[in-house]
């Protein structure tokens, strides 16, 4: 059986999780796209207020019960959530979540190296 190369997927989430279910839905979609290889070819960039998805207290996040089911998988995979330089960040991050601040150049590089890009 021939080896099929993995597709590099970039998911950019800018939707405000405190106002819209789109941010949690974007993470659910990212989980599905990364599930074939435990997220190894998946990059997630959070901009705007999207970093609140990774807050220690997500009680104000729309669809937080769905978020609570999916975040542990990303933590298990060791997925690094990249935080855009202009993003609003929560006062306290969720423990064990891999957080990486990123530069505009790193974001541009992620777009260039991705085979597929989804923006929410």
Task: Describe the residue ranges of each PLM region.
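Positively charged, low-complexity intrinsically disordered leader regions
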Residues: 1-5
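Residues at the starts of beta-strands that form the adenosine-phosphate
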Residues: 8, 41-43, 80
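Short, glycine-rich nucleotide/cofactor-binding loops
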Residues: 11-26, 51-58
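Histidine-anchored nucleotide/phosphate-binding helix
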Residues: 23-44
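Short beta-alpha junction loops
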Residues: 47-52, 86-89
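Short glycine-enriched, charge-decorated loop/helix-capping segments at active-site entrances
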Residues: 57-62, 97
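A glycine-rich helix N-cap at a beta->alpha junction
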Residues: 60-87
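Low-complexity intrinsically disordered segments
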Residues: 96-120
